[in-house]
Amino acid sequence: MMKQFWIGYWFKPWYFLYRIGYAIVISGIRGYFKNHQYDGKENIPANTGVLYAVNHQNAFLDPIVIAGRTKEPTHFLARADIFKKPMVAKILSMIYMLPIYRQRDGVDTIKMNQKTFDTCFDILKNKGNVIIFPEGNHNYKKSLRPLKKGVSRIALGAAEKYNYDIDVKIVVLGLDYENHFKMNGSLYLNAGTPIDVSEYYENHKKNPSETINNLSDRIYHTLSSLIINIKDDENYDELYYLLHRVPFENNSNKVSLKFKLRKERLEKIEKLEKTNASLYEEIVSFMSELKITMKKFKLRPYLLHQKPNSLLSLFLYSLLLILFSPFHIIGLTTNYLPYKTPVWFVNSKVKDKHFHSSLKMALGSLFFYLYWFIITIIFSQFFGWKYGILFFITLPLIAAFNYKYWIYFIKVRGLWNYKLNYKSILSLRVKYLNYYATIK
């Protein structure tokens, strides 16, 4: 991927704007997410038309993280209202976005969308890629909503247009974000085995509606198996906390393993809801209590698995923070503004939180490179260009150190808080360990 990023893709026959955007996305993914993993990419077929059917949790971030992991330009459908201005429509077409109309747009949706569908048919015939979010809208919740039939209609519509002499595959792709709205979480892309649309050609000729429904059902069940699907919406926040904050016995940082453990825990708690509803309600209620208490004392549940550290060890940990604080201050001068400026801007100007991550990632990439370029020029004026180049090379290393220092600071602060408030949360710890035996 890095070789392709720095050399190969610049020479591809893509729109220049798309190549610039691709560079930003590749850099952004590596900087914005602490860990990212793409499983099943060997399932992506080559030399054929591919329709990606993807769950939709994060507005514009969903398509760009997929586009950033593909070797060819990927088209995706977007709300038609953002195409209203001709200049904007031109720019959007240069990054391979296609308009999809809804009834609220006040147009003949069948007629207008048919143009987009015809374009998709041609893209698939020419062995291109199209991303579709069959849920129809975005929602940060890790719950699969009912699917629209657009994926099936486009796949089988392309077949019908070309007299069923076309090779089309549907790749069902699950996206999972550890944290939808903040950086340094993990990103997991999970591709299933491709669905060969030709399996449905004969039935589609005889009964189009039934075939579209059958294919859509298959997509739904496949997608559900590839994501975290919390069905209890009433207790969603508590279940999310249980899956993402309560630690596992296997404390691996591997993204795919964490995803697997979360799915297994969710299946266990869903089974408990059916077999022991009263215990299920107790655990859900306790998760609410746990979340409030942890927030109050600025703690994480993993601390409840251990007794407080000794004062000597806490002083030694704190001494390390003091010793390395000068390097942290240097890191703040070279990284704080480009890190915080996009956060301040997006949080204050963008109301829909579903767009926050994509904007923070894109703006953060631009701001970091711009800020580093400016301070390198200033540094070079005082110390010369040789040292200026060396300074620029060290900036990413300083940023990495600063991030590690901040994480270490948070952990040490948590250890101190746990030590100082242990008596206040002792009864909660006992309850937690009792429930953990059921949910671990």
Label every PLM stretch briefly:
Residues 1-2, 100, 191, 220-223:
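Intrinsic structural disorder
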Residues 1-16, 293-319:
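Compositionally biased, charge-rich terminal segments
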Residues 4, 247, 258, 431-438:
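Intrinsic disorder/low-structure terminal segments
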Residues 11-25, 30-210, 328-440:
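Soluble catalytic domains of membrane acyltransferases
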Residues 16, 87, 119, 199, ...:
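Exposed alpha-helical structural elements
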Residues 210, 217, 221-303:
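Long, charge-rich alpha-helical interaction segments
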